[in-house]
């Protein structure tokens, strides 16, 4: 493989990303491109080279953006440098996608020739178009018997509105059509532009950062103007932090050291940065002595949207959980956590996530990579409380809700959801959206598929909306959303009381109209799960002081009159009265043990 020279002319660089829905073959295509340009030898190829986390490979999703630099000798005899940034496809990581896209000039739009366009493809394509990308359409999996390239081309033109007549037909699995993709990248995608050239003050985009056990934080950068050299003192314009660059290089996907990176190039730097949180995706990097006049637009720190409590099943694992979370945060600055304690579950953490998939992935990584057993409380969103004294505050945890008398209004976040589904499932999906307080914005048909746009409260989506959508549509519907605004809602805090004691881990915010149904389901579920005690246990769902649902677990009863044969009835009555008095005393002082399984099942209640 030829060694990368640091001075590649701009006209010979192509920066591109691959936009695709989950499972449409994005990572496999990336593998083929690496293989056919000699980026890795045959023996070093593993399936999905760029998806380095086990979870990424298993779930078939890309979570962190990864990059690779390829050298390609085109049919015109020239050698081009191709920088591929592999972007996440899932809605939770939309900000990572937008930053990755802004580091490129073009995108490959990969669509499965048997499945067609999905909701997430749409969202990412519109982001690519917003970034003024040139698009090359690639139809993958054309070796499948179910592939219908002509129908899908029409669908792309109808749904997305771009010309797909010259789409490249490939099969990433067998390698068919890969050379055509490489030629299309070189001839159809534009070269990067640099206004100042390599002598201008340094201006570079921070595309991503990750933690390496040996080198500390590694930062992936795209140089816009100027030159990024070893030994230079750089400054992050968003956080104003300064660092000295220790090493500069590119990923092929192995690390290759270089002296400098010039305009249009994508590579990595290390600079003794201790935490990933200090490097914010989307920030502008410049030279400290000779800074650029203006930072790049569009930088915003990631805000957590969904919160939930994570508690160790065994209290002895608390310190292990703390250190595991610290390690994950090194690699994922959008994940936040703080300590909280619950009367029912002991010590744990209140964690903030970008969305539900993000929550699931963090929980799964904690359990798998650090071997922890965890209980997650019901997810909640960020509510805005407008108080009667004119102040405003955010509520992340329903258990911290202040007295209702002090609250003037509660505002909850709403989302704009796009759902694509085969039309035979439309009725069920419309009903699901209506049950979740959705407001229909539009409904359009594309061939045999319906495209729905709905406004929905995020509170109704975080529970189990996605699972319900998949089960109604037998897995065919796809779903994508953006958070739009906070609106006033008729929301109440529902508490669950067991034997008159509130259980903090089970309290949740619900809409007043749905409270009774939700409360009844919860009480019934707990009645099945809590074992019988020697005394009667009432389980109640309450809003403030009003009980809205109740179930009672009957007492285990010992037959105290068994030893009385015949004889006086008053003798039996005396024993029964004594038993009754004992049970009354027990109920007053007795503690109800709620097993861990009951918590886990009650919190999963909405998945059914």
UniProtKB/Swiss-Prot annotation:
It is found in: Cell inner membrane. Keywords: Cell inner membrane, Cell membrane, GTP-binding, Hydrolase, Membrane, Nucleotide-binding, Protein biosynthesis. It is an enzyme of class 3 (hydrolase). GTP binds at residues 23-28, 140-143. GO terms for cellular component: plasma membrane. CDD domains: EF4_II, EF4_III, LepA, lepA_C. One of its GO terms (molecular function) is GTPase activity. It comes from the Bacteria. It catalyses: GTP + H2O = GDP + phosphate + H(+). InterPro entries: EF-4, EFG_III/V, EFG_V-like, EFTu-like_2, G_TR_CS, LepA_C_sf, LepA_CTD, LepA_IV. Its EC number is 3.6.5.n1. It is a peripheral membrane protein. The keyword GTP-binding applies. Coiled coil: none annotated. The keyword GTP-binding applies. Belongs to the TRAFAC class translation factor GTPase superfamily. Classic translation factor GTPase family. LepA subfamily. Required for accurate and efficient protein synthesis under certain stress conditions. May act as a fidelity factor of the translation reaction, by catalyzing a one-codon backward translocation of tRNAs on improperly translocated ribosomes. Back-translocation proceeds from a post-translocation (POST) complex to a pre-translocation (PRE) complex, thus giving elongation factor G a second chance to translocate the tRNAs correctly. Binds to ribosomes in a GTP-dependent manner. This is Elongation factor 4. It comes from Rhizobium meliloti (strain 1021) (Ensifer meliloti). The lineage of its organism: Bacteria, Pseudomonadati, Pseudomonadota, Alphaproteobacteria, Hyphomicrobiales. The gene is lepA.
